[in-house]
């Protein structure tokens, strides 16, 4: 991330500096502003037939690419609560996360600003009332501002993961980890 500030927000000095890739510091008044990592969540929702549910992104970054259901963690919200909320908002589905799978750093570029994130991924098995993922998808209501549609992909090999047009490298790494532990 480069320094986007031209003036110190506290004293107005033009001497504000970007330090060590972590914070802005004004040597004139001592103001410092840390650029902390944002927390984001995603879920690998799978069925008994090695099918995984993906969303098709409706907006940048990476509009039109596949992603795992999820999003940013809100202030004062746990990662577990965030993934349940995101599934409800984006898909109209009540999903209970099964277990924590992994986390990976990610870079999220939005409106030409680079945000560093820590993406936390969970797994959940398809709710028992559905015979398979296609049956489940028929019940979903997409959040139009976030999701163009849903895709079900068979994921049982590294080659199948490599062939996916994924929006984010953290999802790619997560699916490889999912294959290792399932």
Give names to the regions the model predicted:
Residues 45-46, 54, 124, 152:
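Conserved hydrophobic "DFG−1" position in protein kinase catalytic cores
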Residues 73-99, 104-167:
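Unchanged
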Residues 28, 57, 70, 152-157:
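Active-site donor-binding loop signature of nucleotide-sugar glycosyltransferases
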Residues 1-43, 48:
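Acidic, metal-coordinating catalytic segment for phosphate/diphosphate chemistry
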Residues 167-182:
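Charged phosphate-binding loop/patch that engages nucleotide di/tri-phosphates or the phosphate backbone
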Residues 37, 64, 114-118:
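Residue-level preference for beta-strand/loop junctions
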């Amino acid at each position: 991330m480069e320094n986007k500030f031209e003036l110190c927000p506290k004293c107005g000095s033009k001497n504000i500096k970007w330090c060590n890739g972590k914070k802005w510091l004004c040597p004139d008044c001592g103001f410092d502003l840390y650029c902390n990592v944002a927390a984001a969540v995603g879920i690998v929702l799978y069925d008994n037939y090695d099918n995984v549910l993906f969303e098709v992104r409706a907006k940048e970054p990476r509009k039109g690419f596949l992603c795992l259901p999820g999003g940013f963690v809100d202030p004062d919200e746990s990662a577990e609560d965030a993934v349940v909320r995101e599934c409800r908002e984006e898909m109209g589905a009540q999903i209970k996360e099964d277990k924590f799978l992994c986390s990976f750093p990610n870079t999220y570029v939005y409106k030409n600003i680079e945000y560093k994130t820590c993406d936390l991924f969970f797994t959940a098995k398809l709710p028992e009332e559905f015979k398979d993922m296609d049956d489940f998808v028929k019940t979903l209501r997409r959040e139009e501002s976030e999701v163009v549609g849903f895709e079900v992909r068979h994921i049982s090999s590294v080659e199948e993961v490599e062939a996916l047009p994924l929006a984010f490298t953290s999802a790619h790494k997560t699916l490889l980890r999912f294959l290792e532990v399932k």
